[in-house]
Amino acid sequence: SSAASDVYKRQALVTGAARGIGKAVAMKFASEGANIAFTDLVLNDDMAAGLEATRKEIEALGVTCRAYAGNAADFEETQKTVKQIHEDFGSIDILVNNAGITKDGLMLRMSEAQWDAVLNVNLKSAFNFIHACSPIMLRQRGGSIINMASVVGVHGNAGQCNYAASKAGMIALAKSIAQELGPKGVRANAVAPGFIETAMTAQLPEEIRKDWMQKIPLRRGGQTEDIANVCLFLASDLSSYVSGQVIQIDGGMNM
């Protein structure tokens, strides 16, 4: 069967999906018929407008879509958000922990605030959503959890010790959850994007971009859809015997 029929009418929850990779994942799932709940942080009118614009774009694909403004790093708030999503959709079959930020800097110059912010938004938020969604998936005796990690979570990166540590944590979290929840039919995996063309990477200086391209055998940056396609595979029954794995999506940069 195709991946499309596998996720058709399933309920997916994607965090941090108003833009970038998260949005691409939500759109891909929706294009295959999955209903979408997504979250993102809303601090001002522009962010609120972005959230609603993405919701309409997803809904236009012919599925049910609801957007939930909130801080994924807040444990109590996440419990309430997931409870609301479960009431609104009736089930949560797929969870993609995508909410993430960077606050780069060399370790010796890094502030405690830079460290805490990245660990909270990237790693703690993943724990928060897994903690809230797991009982639902266990009662359903099935579900797929996907953590959005990074190649730097596998290999490290100078100037990104906070980000790399948070992404390595997301990988170990996925592996541990795969072991804990596997007996009840819940799978957990991580995807590790390499150099992906997003607003986040567009800000990099040209010489750094050139340097990256030389390290990539396919000689190009990835597209957000490249990540979404692998997430679709992991969300679907095509990957029903795949759990506790890290899939690097990096054009062959790391082997």
Regions found by a protein language model. Name each.
Residues K9-A37, I177:
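Canonical Rossmann dinucleotide-binding motif of NAD(H)/NADP(H)-dependent dehydrogenases/reductases
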Residues L106-M107, Q114-L119, T201, W212:
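Substrate-binding pocket helix/loop in short-chain dehydrogenase/reductase
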Residues P135, Q179-P183, S240:
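Alpha-helical segment proximal to the catalytic Tyr-Lys
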